[in-house]
Amino acid sequence: MLTLGELAKKLDAELIGEASHVVDGLGTIQSAGPSQLTFLANPRYRSFLEQTNAGAVLIPESQREFCPVPALIVKDPYLSFAKASAFFEVAPQVQPGVHPAAVVDATAQIHTSASIGPNAVVEAGVIVGEGAVIMANSVVGAGCHIGDQCRIWPNVTIYHGVTLGPRTTIHANCVIGGDGFGFAFNGAGWTKLHQVGGVTIGADVEIGAGTTVDRGAIEDTIIGDGVILDNQIQVAHNVVIGDHTAIAGKAGIAGSAKIGSFCLIGGAAGIAGHIEVCDKVQILAMSLVSSSIKEPGTYGSALPVDSQSRYRRNVARFRNLDDLARRVRKLERLSD
């Protein structure tokens, strides 16, 4: 619960309205009530702004005259709304200490302010930093280092030899440090290449539910500072992801791929192994990246949806492209 005056100071915003007005939650611009904060970032939704009943709206200067309720004028309304969300988050309360039902090896080093939940397992040699939280049923393997203020949600499995930087969040059902997909064909079957590397995850990383990050075959799989990974992403062994890259759900990154910093990768995109993607690349959803990308920019390869009849006709034409290309070359030679 904050007054608009307090919010304006925290967000470095210009307040239009009563500084004493109190907001106690967040809402959409269509549904927010008199005690809720909302935002308008896209001018296409101005009609919602003109009809809103919100307690206050975060808006850019250009929308000042259209706002019928108290406003907070900011440069980037969505960014300011994201910052404001931290003031209203209702997160589960945890208490420092080790739950009686947790299993913690005697050699583990647990900071006195850390919290270990029921049925969690913390194996030998683990270091758990100040204010870190390991919730119910999660397992932290031998020799791991869990940084200060990390939050590991329930049912996470972190294999041995994994390092989490400070303030990193791992959501439920993630597996960090499982074996990479390394096998050598021996003529009659497969011989496993034992994965002896680890996983190093930087500071301020967020990894969504059900995502898997495999350990390195020899050297570590590395995820840089500030990376955000959505739900159900596969990161294979020895992948390197640069700082502040964002990857949407169901993307798959094959072994030893290197992705630069400040990249945006859309949902269900596939990155082939042993290639490099430079900094500041945007890859559209469902695209297949089969070779290295050396220039920043936006790239895509997926076909957009179409009616069934048009799609089937286009597929038929696609199958004839090779023959068509030969005919065109023949005509070009005849015309010379």
Curated annotation (Swiss-Prot):
Pathway: Bacterial outer membrane biogenesis; LPS lipid A biosynthesis. It is an enzyme of class 2 (transferase). It comes from the Bacteria. It catalyses: a UDP-3-O-[(3R)-3-hydroxyacyl]-alpha-D-glucosamine + a (3R)-hydroxyacyl-[ACP] = a UDP-2-N,3-O-bis[(3R)-3-hydroxyacyl]-alpha-D-glucosamine + holo-[ACP] + H(+). The keyword Acyltransferase applies. CDD domains: LbH_LpxD. The keyword Transferase applies. One of its GO terms (biological process) is lipid A biosynthetic process. GO terms for molecular function: N-acyltransferase activity. GO terms for cellular component: membrane. Keywords: Acyltransferase, Lipid A biosynthesis, Lipid biosynthesis, Lipid metabolism, Repeat, Transferase. The active site is at 237 (proton acceptor). Its EC number is 2.3.1.191. Catalyzes the N-acylation of UDP-3-O-acylglucosamine using 3-hydroxyacyl-ACP as the acyl donor. Is involved in the biosynthesis of lipid A, a phosphorylated glycolipid that anchors the lipopolysaccharide to the outer membrane of the cell. Belongs to the transferase hexapeptide repeat family. LpxD subfamily. This is UDP-3-O-acylglucosamine N-acyltransferase. It comes from Alcanivorax borkumensis (strain ATCC 700651 / DSM 11573 / NCIMB 13689 / SK2).
